[in-house]
UniProtKB/Swiss-Prot annotation:
It catalyses: N(2)-acetyl-L-ornithine + L-glutamate = N-acetyl-L-glutamate + L-ornithine; L-glutamate + acetyl-CoA = N-acetyl-L-glutamate + CoA + H(+). InterPro entries: Arg_biosynth_ArgJ, ArgJ-like_dom_sf, ArgJ_beta_C. Pfam families: ArgJ (PF01960). HAMAP family: ArgJ. GO terms for cellular component: cytoplasm. The gene is argJ. Catalyzes two activities which are involved in the cyclic version of arginine biosynthesis: the synthesis of N-acetylglutamate from glutamate and acetyl-CoA as the acetyl donor, and of ornithine by transacetylation between N(2)-acetylornithine and glutamate. The record marks 116-117 as: Involved in the stabilization of negative charge on the oxyanion by the formation of the oxyanion hole. One of its GO terms (molecular function) is glutamate N-acetyltransferase activity. It comes from the Bacteria. GO terms for biological process: L-arginine biosynthetic process; ornithine biosynthetic process. This is Arginine biosynthesis bifunctional protein ArgJ. Substrate binds at residues 153, 179, 190, 276, 400, 405.
Length: 405
């Protein structure tokens, strides 16, 4: 039920990256649910992970492995989150890494594991071990779309995008894939994203690039306000192109940053459009705050309000629910006489009261659209922010009520 989400575009290969998938029977029948992303030696890697205190075992292991090594393989499974599994979960993740490391002739610390799926169940290690030799054999540079499908859980469509640009007179590619549909309010930061570029970029510079991209994309979305135990976003740089970016002051860095942010934003918005049960894509704009933090407070309070989200689902211009969300957002000393509210281009509230020219018909017209913008002006500063969310439908309840059955 993706809200205005188009079919997966053609994903461009990234020199130095090969990908493969296999049906390991982790939770799903007759569909790939295990994937690896192999990266050439000498590549660099940046990553951000969930800040959920109950982070999953693969997050713990991936952080450890990434601390002192450049990874050669990403190992990803769908259907089992390996979260809430204690020490055994960590042992299981390490065991799977060791199996792939033996196949690849690398140290187990050169493997980064990632999992998504049901929380609280032990990883079926033997099934993964049995399937790894098969996935190893089918890796290819064109496997991006296959991996995008293999890592899906409640997603209804695979998500991926590519950007190709010229820098220093040479071509550069950035390709990324992601999964996510529910339990979405990333704080990097169930959401996983994997990006790669063929530019040559030192790890610290790559980390800065990813952090900026994530801040303007994945950390600006919410489906249901729940932050997963398994959130992770990875950016690989293979150095296989002729473009080398040594510092953030390098003129080429700005071009790479723009491309990475574009890919991140496309993936993040695709996750929202594929939000569990989503029928509408909602942009919440808050301007006129004293700082970004209070703009975020207001935006997220609106975006995560069940009453606002169900009003959007019903195409009901119930602006009182939005005002209530603004009022309870916790902005200190908020003067309501400075607040204005817009549904699309229609001004509903001006100076804290109903605009005399607003009509219910205007509101219904806006709320009936597939893409809705809710805009708030606080009238107390110059800060502004955008958050993206979706509506809350009957299907969301059904999907999550039946998730483990």
């Amino acid at each position: 039920m993706a809200a205005g989400l188009e079919h997966l575009q053609e994903l461009l290969p990234v020199a130095g990256v090969e990908l493969g998938t296999v049906a390991a029977g982790i939770r799903y029948r007759d569909r790939p649910d295990l994937a690896i992303i192999a990266v050439t030696g000498g590549s660099t890697c940046a990553a951000v992970f969930t800040r959920n205190a109950f982070c999953a075992a693969p997050v713990i292991v991936a952080r450890r492995h990434l601390a002192g090594n450049s990874p050669r393989f990403l190992l990803i499974n769908a259907g089992n989150a390996n979260a809430g599994t204690g020490i055994q979960g960590i042992v299981d993740a390490e065991t799977c890494c060791a199996t792939l490391a033996e196949l690849g002739g690398v140290a187990s610390t050169a493997i980064l594991p990632f999992s998504t799926g049901v929380i609280g169940e032990l990883l079926p290690v033997s099934r993964i071990q049995a399937a790894l030799p098969q996935v190893w054999q089918v890796c290819s540079p064109t496997g991006w779309s296959s991996v995008a499908r293999a890592i899906m859980t409640t997603d209804t469509v695979p998500k991926g995008t590519s950007v190709h640009f010229t820098c220093q007179g040479h071509p550069v590619t950035v390709t990324g894939i992601a999964k996510g549909s529910g339990m979405i309010r990333p704080d990097m930061a169930t959401m996983l994203a994997f990006l790669a570029t063929d530019a040559q970029v030192p790890k610290k510079v790559l980390q800065r690039c990813l952090a900026r991209g994530v801040a303007e994309s994945f950390n600006r979305i919410t489906v249901d306000g729940d932050t997963s135990t398994n959130d992770a976003c990875v950016l690989l740089a293979t150095g296989q192109s002729e473009v080398s970016i040594a510092t953030i002051e390098d003129p080429a860095f700005a071009a790479l940053q723009q491309a990475v942010t574009e890919v991140c934003l496309s993936l993040a918005q695709a996750i929202v459009r594929d939000g569990e049960g989503a029928t509408k894509f909602i942009t919440v704009e808050v301007a006129g705050g004293r700082n970004i933090q209070e703009c975020e407070q207001v935006a997220y309070t609106i975006a995560q309000s069940p009453l606002v989200k169900t009003a959007c689902f019903a195409s009901d211009p119930n602006w009182g629910r939005i005002l209530a969300a603004i009022g309870r957002s916790g902005v200190p000393d908020l003067e309501i006489t400075g607040v204005s509210l817009y549904l699309g281009e229609a001004c509903v509230i001006h100076g804290g009261v109903l605009h005399p020219e607003y009509t219910e018909e205007q509101g219904r017209t806006v709320m009936a659209q597939d893409d809705i913008t809710l805009a708030v002006e606080l009238g107390r500063g110059d800060a502004r922010v955008q958050i993206w969310t979706c509506d809350l439908s009957f299907a969301y309840v059904k999907i999550n009520a039946e998730y483990r059955s």
